[in-house]
A protein has these predicted regions:
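Conserved N-terminal boundary motif of the eukaryotic protein kinase catalytic domain
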Residues: 24-32
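Active-site acidic catalytic loop and adjacent metal/ATP-binding pocket
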Residues: 34-46, 50-54, 165-207
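Start-of-helix signal in alpha-solenoid helical-repeat scaffolds, especially tetratricopeptide repeats
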Residues: 68, 251-254
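ATP-binding pocket architecture of kinase catalytic cores
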Residues: 32-137
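Active-site activation/catalytic loop segments of kinase-like enzymes and analogous catalytic loops
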Residues: 206-238, 253-271
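An alpha-helical support segment within catalytic cores of ATP-dependent transferases
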Residues: 8-25, 130-180, 184, 281-284
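ATP/Mg2+ or Mg2+-diphosphate-binding catalytic cores
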Residues: 261-287
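A general structural signal marking secondary-structure boundaries and capping sites
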Residues: 82, 125-133, 168-169, 216, ...
Length: 287
């Protein structure tokens, strides 16, 4: 009985979501997709055969450091740069987005050859860095502190684990438009198309590269290849990087720390093996 009631509630929520869309999209039907870790995702089918991707944003974006206005600003710029899929309808305040459908698989399902990945992502970063700099900044220390402050319960092992990192000094001398979540699931096709801009903000490009290295499981060598491809595409050392390069290595522990805190937050809201695996992995990296 409880399972049936839950299913009916889900069906009603989908009908309500569909009815909220403008014509002709409200005449379609929704097919739930494997959801991201914070959003609800659907394939929308119209009677004409046209398809679209519908994303329902997380109802509490502030909890995860998401600024919807900045997400929309960066997304629109990314469409202009050929990085993001066109949008048919959006409600930026709620994070609802209806996008053109893409049949190409993401890199988690069908990654390009490993040797092709650094130049492809270098091209993504070069176009990303042409966008106007957002006013909202995602500085790793403040961002991680926000996550930590929102924890309902701080694990007993966390203070000792974070002490050395919080006593260190991270690079803070370069700010560029960043996506902050260029993981394989957010890259579609060989192009690639970039989706899920909700963590986008001004950020340090070193954190962006460190995040790529961690989420793609790259070696230091592959990360350095990406850096070289980026600089070659700009004709050498570029003023955007203040002549110091990306300084990505300094941000690897910050990627692990923020990933740990994010997983702890999610596990408080929705306990499960996926979040526990992320907690265990990032904790081990920081030990």
């Amino acid at each position: 009985m409880a399972g049936e009631a839950t299913r009916q509630q889900g069906d009603l929520a989908e009908l309500t979501l569909l009815a909220s869309l403008p014509a002709p999209w409200n005449q379609g039907c929704l097919e739930p997709l494997a959801s991201g870790l914070t959003n609800g995702n659907y394939r929308l089918h119209l009677p004409s055969g046209q398809r679209a991707f519908l994303r329902r944003g997380h109802p509490d974006p502030v909890r995860f450091g998401i600024d919807r206005a900045t997400e929309w600003q960066l997304y629109q710029g990314a469409v202009g740069q050929g990085l993001a899929l066109p949008c048919y309808h959006s409600e930026p305040a709620s994070g609802l987005m209806l996008l053109a459908w893409c049949d190409e698989p993401n890199w988690a399902a069908a990654p390009p050859p490993l040797a092709a990945q650094p130049p492809l992502l270098a091209a993504v970063l070069r176009r990303l860095h042409r966008l106007p700099l957002p006013a909202v900044v995602m500085a790793v220390r403040a961002h991680s502190a926000g996550y930590r402050d929102r924890l309902a319960r701080v694990p007993a092992w966390l203070p000792a684990l974070e002490r050395a990192l919080l006593a260190s000094r991270e690079p803070d001398d370069c700010w560029l438009p960043c996506h902050h979540d260029l993981n394989p699931a957010n890259l579609l096709g060989h192009r690639p198309w970039v989706i899920d801009w909700e963590y986008g903000a001004a950020g340090h490009p070193g954190f962006e590269l460190a995040s790529i290295q961690r989420t793609h499981g790259w070696s230091d060598e592959l990360r350095c290849q990406l850096e070289s491809c980026y600089l070659e595409g700009r004709g050498g050392a570029h003023k955007l990087l203040n002549t110091k390069g990306f300084q990505a290595e300094a941000f690897l522990p910050w990627v692990d720390y923020i990933g740990l805190l994010w997983a702890l937050l999610m596990a408080e809201q929705q306990p499960g093996p996926d979040y526990q695996a992320l907690i265990d992995m990032n904790r081990q990296r920081l030990e």
